[in-house]
Amino acid sequence: MNDRQAALDQALKQIEKQFGKGSIMKLGEHSDQNISTISSGSLALDIALGVGGYPRGRIIEVYGPESSGKTTVALHAIAEVQAQGGTAAFIDAEHALDPAYAKNLGVNIDELLLSQPDTGEQALEIAEALVRSGAVDMLVIDSVAALVPRAEIEGEMGDAHVGLQARLMSQALRKLSGAINKSKTIAIFINQIREKVGVMFGNPEITPGGRALKFYSTVRLEVRRAEQLKQGTDVMGNKTKIKVVKNKVAPPFRIAEVDIMYGEGISREGELVDMAAEVDVINKSGSWYSYKEERIGQGRENAKQYLKEHTDIRDEISKRVREEYEIDGSNKEPLAETEETLSLLDDE
């Protein structure tokens, strides 16, 4: 047994000498046993994710039909990162980002790094450079479907380019995944939906870009509109369901229901009323909502309005709900450069 241990110790020394300190270690000695997260900007989604937000150093895929709220979900996460003093980058391959809308959601557009690349290769090379800098806390790519390979852009209309985009994504993710993990960057890939032709049984919907992103993603979120939210005859927004289709850090298949209001994004008051009523932080009796024996509104919309006007009570309820769901922020780490992240470029 001693000979085996001596041989193992010798092998470990050789590995550390060749590849550097920390290249191999016992799992229990690893400093990051608890998953460090950054809030998604939505209380309901933080709860559905099971760990209180998006895990750092991981790849997230957000997909769904057109105008379902995918970019809104990503922009809320960017606003949350910036609010904590972090740096965020947005690679706008669709060339469709609305700065005014982003500002309404709380994004500091003066500090947001923005790139509008010409080709898929350029977009992914920029993404790699940002990740390897070790100074970017969140990177959003909108969208995978718009990452058009250079050969397709330079070719003629009607030319066949079978599997080019899938190969591009597969190669990029092989290079990016390790750097994303080391730099603790959250990489959010927004994706669209396509339909297979001639599928008789099962779900015909697929996401572009091949299978690689599905495998490399720690979390996959499906965003879909459930119903319209009306005030009289005017449509004010959509009730949206965000389903955690894949989750490697907590149980999957949980669903977050949020109100996405036009021009405002996710209604924090709406989801707070729902989540607080679920755990009896807010009491619902008939159509009346009350908090600590005090009525805060008749009907959900009035309760939302009350919380919007009384931010101190809203923050108090939010804190209590997070404690009930055990996502009180104890697994958060400060957003700061570390020796490990800053040495990423030197490793090249």
From Swiss-Prot:
Q: Please, one GO biological process term?
A: DNA recombination
Gene3D superfamilies to which the protein is assigned, alphabetical: P-loop containing nucleotide triphosphate hydrolases
**What protein does this entry describe?**
Protein RecA
Q: Name one GO molecular function term.
A: single-stranded DNA binding
- Superkingdom of origin: Bacteria
Which Gene Ontology terms of cellular component type are present?
cytosol
Q: What organism does the record attribute this protein to?
A: Listeria ivanovii
Entries under HAMAP family matching the protein: RecA (MF_00268)
Keyword Membrane among UniProt keywords: no
Biased amino acid composition, Acidic residues: 336-348
Per UniProt, subcellular location reads as: Cytoplasm
Instruction: Please describe what this protein does.
Output: Can catalyze the hydrolysis of ATP in the presence of single-stranded DNA, the ATP-dependent uptake of single-stranded DNA by duplex DNA, and the ATP-dependent hybridization of homologous single-stranded DNAs. It interacts with LexA causing its activation and leading to its autocatalytic cleavage.
- Residue numbers binding ATP: 64-71
Basic and acidic residues bias: where? 324-335
This protein's major location comes to cytoplasm
State the Pfam families in the record: RecA (PF00154), RecA_C (PF21096)
